[in-house]
Amino acid sequence: MDKDCEMKRTTLDSPLGKLELSGCEQGLHEIKLLGKGTSAADAVEVPAPAAVLGGPEPLMQCTAWLNAYFHQPEAIEEFPVPALHHPVFQQESFTRQVLWKLLKVVKFGEVISYQQLAALAGNPKAARAVGGAMRGNPVPILIPCHRVVCSSGAVGNYSGGLAVKEWLLAHEGHRLGKPGLGGSSGLAGAWLKGAGATSGSPPAGRN
């Protein structure tokens, strides 16, 4: 962590229980799932949107983004993703590359396999390393590690618990079972067909 970071924290209620957001003026550091996990069957139980209070801009942006995710998912693309300042995003690594690809390519309502995501990050044989990157994701939901599933159609593991992953997928319209990986009409599908697993670079201003 940058020694100049003045860390601030805020919490908000969600269908998954309380979420704790932490960050500084330079960017968001973490999203922690504090509450008890829920089941996919409870997807209609959504608390009222959290108030967007004062604080570092990245925390306010993240609160607004999460409110949209849970309450206005059809408008999610209108809300900016906050700058990210966790140490994992401050230096080049395979984990950083995987997380950026996942954020930029796999959109709401899409899923991708561990192997496909490894290919997008430049190493098709690194599916296990992708799993490690998902476990180390400091900002779940925002960087959607819940959208990474097994090629077999199994949901796969999730740091927040299987019930949480199933809820998030159900919230995005997925039926559990064999998925249509990437979605041939979606951005992920376009990358998988046309990009040929090129690695690319993180977007400017996200260092």
Curated annotation (Swiss-Prot):
Binds 1 zinc ion. It catalyses: a 6-O-methyl-2'-deoxyguanosine in DNA + L-cysteinyl-[protein] = S-methyl-L-cysteinyl-[protein] + a 2'-deoxyguanosine in DNA; a 4-O-methyl-thymidine in DNA + L-cysteinyl-[protein] = a thymidine in DNA + S-methyl-L-cysteinyl-[protein]. GO terms for molecular function: DNA binding; DNA-methyltransferase activity; metal ion binding; methylated-DNA-[protein]-cysteine S-methyltransferase activity; methyltransferase activity. The active site is at 145 (nucleophile). Its EC number is 2.1.1.63. It is found in: Nucleus. Keywords: DNA damage, DNA repair, DNA-binding, Metal-binding, Methyltransferase, Nucleus, Phosphoprotein, Transferase, Zinc. It comes from the Eukaryota. Zn(2+) binds at residues 5, 24, 29, 85. Belongs to the MGMT family. Involved in the cellular defense against the biological effects of O6-methylguanine (O6-MeG) and O4-methylthymine (O4-MeT) in DNA. Repairs the methylated nucleobase in DNA by stoichiometrically transferring the methyl group to a cysteine residue in the enzyme. This is a suicide reaction: the enzyme is irreversibly inactivated. This is Methylated-DNA--protein-cysteine methyltransferase. The lineage of its organism: Eukaryota, Metazoa, Chordata, Craniata, Vertebrata. The gene is MGMT.
